[in-house]
């Protein structure tokens, strides 16, 4: 026999109402087998022998899906599509394959004739609308919760990405520093060779001298970067960009240094250089003459990283008679660490 489009939907509605007790308009995948059993019960009513709605293979596939996707939500309007994907046959064709009589479906719950019971149909419409609205509100709330959960995951991933980016930048800076240090030591290790009769103390002095020269070169590089940054700020202030644009008329009237931004930068730079000169002079004066244990004992200012760099900068700058010797042991050590083989 031929079934119209509402026949399969009628069977689904009858079975769905038996499983979806809360009228949520969806069921979980774990309730899928129960829905299939309800459909078989509806189709078997009035029959002498129970009708087989699905084959054993189809039931096995649905049972496996229910176990693996236990809390997967199956909405009413998506059921037929999911059923077709699992069984490989449309829900309508499966109903027709049971050869159930249409009279059985009419007895189980065919919609009443609108012309005979208009009052009942009108009274049920508001309830149906309210139920649909309630289902939609529930579904929207569920989707909002899922969206909030996904937003939290995205925020966490963004924080992890920022941390990884910072670590990558730190590692890059460290790598560039080690690369500059290696190149500097290697260049000094390629200086003219000395006789093998030179003392070990001279080699130690050369090691310390090379180390201090590298520190001085790093300070010079930093100073150049700061000078370039100051120049850029001056250009921005002259063009009216930067922090000067944010000042109000009140600050222009009562702040005498407002319209003289470059002068403020120059004054700050002079104060900073004056402090460095004072500290360097004090260290140079109190350093005294070097003795045989000068490289094994540290002065009070050498215990501080900043004071040590400034002090050695002025002491090495004032000492222009340093002779360079071969730095073969340190060069060999760097080549072993970096995995460089000589050709």
Curated annotation (Swiss-Prot):
This is Monopolar spindle protein 2. The chain crosses the membrane at residues 264-284. Disulfide bonds: none annotated. GO terms for cellular component: cytoplasm; nuclear membrane; spindle pole body. It comes from Zygosaccharomyces rouxii (strain ATCC 2623 / CBS 732 / NBRC 1130 / NCYC 568 / NRRL Y-229). Pfam families: MPS2. Residues 102-129, 187-206 are annotated as: Disordered. It is a single-pass membrane protein. Keywords: Coiled coil, Cytoplasm, Cytoskeleton, Membrane, Nucleus, Transmembrane, Transmembrane helix. Residues 127-243 form a coiled coil. Residues 113-124 have a biased composition (Polar residues). It comes from the Eukaryota. Residues 187-197 have a biased composition (Basic and acidic residues). GO terms for biological process: protein localization to spindle pole body; spindle pole body duplication. Belongs to the MPS2 family. It is found in: Nucleus membrane; Cytoplasm, Cytoskeleton, Microtubule organizing center, Spindle pole body. Component of the spindle pole body (SPB) required for insertion of the nascent SPB into the nuclear envelope and for the proper execution of spindle pole body (SPB) duplication.
